[in-house]
Amino acid sequence: MNLILMGLPGAGKGTQAEQIVAKYNIPHISTGDMFRAAMKAETEMGLQAKSFIDKGALVPDEVTIGIVRERLSQEDCVRGFLLDGFPRTVAQASALEEIMKDLGKKIDYVLNINVDSGLLLKRLTGRRICKECGATYHLEFNPPAKADVCDKCGGELYQRSDDNEETVANRLDVNIKQTKPLLDFYEELGYLQSINGEQDINKVFADIDVLIGGLA
């Protein structure tokens, strides 16, 4: 099963990715992990990526795509994979189609975890972190027993500056604009599957499981 996982910040992608790879024993391939592994192994593309990163420059598409090609050609991807964080653009998605064709494979589903942006705003702005021990809470979904006080160490809880409403709203807006062309691209190819991410996390996974179970 060859899957791509999509969703806006706060949609719960990480939780669902963990459950998918645990049940189906396929590698969870995130862009960051791919780059780190390629640079550590000193592959041709990894060394090229390192030369850009060391200069503080953006890694060009052809290098990123080369790293994806190297990674998807590895033995642990024979039974499938879960791509997370790639592709980000229609150009990258088109390049991925070519890679899959060359490998004699195809993308089975693009799973888009759908959550209303108002609910995402609530999820993302409700996070609170302990100044002392770093424990994470949520005002609505995982509140501390006593307001603004850490259950574990009694430290003071604070909101990160990038979790404030204006910053989060801007981040969501940028993400929505960036991902729409990609969602349209995959809808046209017939790969796109919309998953209701507003349910309980176990129900979200149950819906994904029903969809992808037949691919195993």
Curated annotation (Swiss-Prot):
Function: Catalyzes the reversible transfer of the terminal phosphate group between ATP and AMP. Plays an important role in cellular energy homeostasis and in adenine nucleotide metabolism.
Positions that bind AMP: T31, R36, A57, L58, V59, G85, F86, P87, R88, Q92, R160, R171
Involved pathway(s): Purine metabolism; AMP biosynthesis via salvage pathway; AMP from ADP: step 1/1
SUPFAM superfamilies per UniProt: P-loop containing nucleoside triphosphate hydrolases
Subcellular location: Cytoplasm
Known EC number: 2.7.4.3
Entry remark concerning the domains of this protein: Consists of three domains, a large central CORE domain and two small peripheral domains, NMPbind and LID, which undergo movements during catalysis. The LID domain closes over the site of phosphoryl transfer upon ATP binding. Assembling and dissambling the active center during each catalytic cycle provides an effective means to prevent ATP hydrolysis. Some bacteria have evolved a zinc-coordinating structure that stabilizes the LID domain.
Gene Ontology BP, a term: AMP salvage
Main location: cytoplasm
One family name in Pfam for this protein: ADK
Any one Gene Ontology cellular component term annotated for this protein: cytoplasm
Gene: adk
InterPro entries: Adenyl_kin_sub, Adenylat/UMP-CMP_kin, Adenylat_kinase_CS, Adenylate_kinase_lid-dom, P-loop_NTPase
UniProt-listed Gene3D superfamilies: P-loop containing nucleotide triphosphate hydrolases
Protein name: Adenylate kinase
Catalytic activity, reaction form: AMP + ATP = 2 ADP
Residue segments, region NMP: 30-59
Residues at which ATP binds: G10, A11, G12, K13, G14, T15, R127, T136, Y137, Q199
Subunit and interaction comment: Monomer.
Span list, region LID: 126-163
Family in the record: Belongs to the adenylate kinase family.
GO molecular function, a single term: zinc ion binding
HAMAP family: Adenylate_kinase_Adk
Residues holding Zn(2+): C130, C133, C150, C153
Assigned keywords, A-Z: ATP-binding, Cytoplasm, Kinase, Metal-binding, Nucleotide biosynthesis, Nucleotide-binding, Transferase, Zinc
